[in-house]
Each structure stands twice: as structure tokens, then as C-alpha cells.
């Protein structure tokens, strides 16, 4: 085979793989995802009554009002395009001081110690969930701020607690955005 034939073969194979792997494969699977899982394929967006996007059920948001449950802290300030952890070791003084400060602020606002998930950042920096225990320690503050009976708020937390995936994987969790939207929907 001459060098020119080898170059021709290489160019043809490159074109075939580029079309197959670079165009056909992504288009087929994107199309499949749009048909089979349209909500997830489009980011699991959450919309309000006016059909405006107010968040995603997969990305945490910062809630600071006493009327809302607060999620996990984010090392990236909840910026989805910058997903990632702080990469600080557990013995890092900066991390230790931040956790202590967050715990003190939480205790001052809630009158109780936080659960570990409320003062540690997730690996992605975007976790939309907290533990049921993390929600429970915020229940008194939220019910007081909204003038709701604590039992009513606890019931809502229980209602929005998701179980383990397939009953065995992961831990029970509460989606903070979904819970806060449900709180906003309560009529007094």
C-alpha cells in the first residue's frame, strides 16, 4: 500500500469515526433521552405557577431566610458551572474554622447544634438534599418564623423525605427546594 493510499484510509476512518462517534451517537442518545426521560434530560427544572424556572431539583440553592429550610453549604456558592469541592483536607485549618463558624451561626439561629451535613460541603458543591435529621433540627425555627405548628412542619418534612434508591442504596434525604416550595404553598 502506498503512502497516499494509507493517508486516504486514515482520512476515511477519521471521517467515519467522527460522524459515528461525534454526531450519530450523541444525537441518538440525546433523542432517546428526550423521548424517554424529558424532565431529566432538560435538567429537572422546577417552575413556579407562572411557568418561570426557579431552580432545579438536582442543584442546591442558597436559602438564608428563617422562613426556609437551609441546605448544605457550598464551596462554590451554588454555581452549577463551577461544580466541585473545596479540596481541603479534614485537618486543614481553614476548613476547621469555617465549619466551627458555620456551626456557631447555625446554633445561634436555631438554638440547637447542627447535623454534620449542615456544616460540611458536598463533593459537587451542589447537593440539593439534606438529611431528615438536618431538616428536623431546623423545624422549630421554620415553624416559629412562619407561625405554623411544629407538628405541621414535621409532617411536611416527613412527606418530603425520599427513601433509599431501590430501597438499599444511599440514605434517606430531603430535597430542600421541594420542601421550601411546599412550605410556601401552605395556607394559614
From Swiss-Prot:
Location in the cell: Cell inner membrane
Single GO MF descriptor: P-type potassium transmembrane transporter activity
InterPro entries: KdpC
Membrane topology note: Single-pass membrane protein
Biological process terms in GO annotation: potassium ion transmembrane transport
TM annotation in the entry: 13-33
Pfam family, one: KdpC
CC terms in the record's Gene Ontology section: plasma membrane
PANTHER family in UniProt: POTASSIUM-TRANSPORTING ATPASE C CHAIN, POTASSIUM-TRANSPORTING ATPASE KDPC SUBUNIT
Subunit structure: The system is composed of three essential subunits: KdpA, KdpB and KdpC.
UniProt function note: Part of the high-affinity ATP-driven potassium transport (or Kdp) system, which catalyzes the hydrolysis of ATP coupled with the electrogenic transport of potassium into the cytoplasm. This subunit acts as a catalytic chaperone that increases the ATP-binding affinity of the ATP-hydrolyzing subunit KdpB by the formation of a transient KdpB/KdpC/ATP ternary complex.
Family recorded in the similarity comment: Belongs to the KdpC family.
Protein name: Potassium-transporting ATPase KdpC subunit
Lineage of origin: Bacteria, Bacillati, Cyanobacteriota, Cyanophyceae, Gloeobacterales
Amino acid at each position: 500500500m502506498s503512502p497516499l493510499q494509507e493517508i486516504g484510509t486514515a482520512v476515511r476512518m477519521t471521517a467515519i469515526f467522527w460522524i459515528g462517534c461525534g454526531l450519530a451517537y450523541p444525537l441518538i442518545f440525546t433523542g432517546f433521552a428526550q423521548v424517554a426521560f424529558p424532565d431529566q434530560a432538560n435538567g429537572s427544572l422546577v417552575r413556579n405557577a407562572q411557568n418561570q424556572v426557579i431552580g432545579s431539583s438536582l442543584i442546591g440553592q442558597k436559602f438564608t431566610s428563617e422562613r426556609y429550610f437551609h441546605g448544605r453549604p457550598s464551596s462554590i456558592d451554588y454555581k452549577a458551572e463551577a461544580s466541585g469541592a473545596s479540596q481541603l483536607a479534614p485537618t486543614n485549618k481553614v476548613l476547621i474554622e469555617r465549619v466551627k463558624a458555620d456551626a456557631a451561626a447555625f446554633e445561634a439561629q436555631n438554638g440547637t447544634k447542627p447535623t454534620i451535613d449542615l456544616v460540611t460541603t458536598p463533593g459537587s458543591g451542589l447537593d440539593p438534599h439534606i438529611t431528615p435529621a438536618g431538616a428536623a433540627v431546623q423545624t422549630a425555627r421554620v415553624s416559629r418564623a412562619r407561625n405554623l405548628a411544629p407538628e405541621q412542619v414535621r409532617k411536611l418534612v416527613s412527606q418530603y423525605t425520599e427513601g433509599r434508591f431501590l430501597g438499599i442504596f444511599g440514605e434517606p434525604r430531603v430535597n430542600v427546594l421541594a420542601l421550601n416550595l411546599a412550605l410556601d404553598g401552605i395556607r394559614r
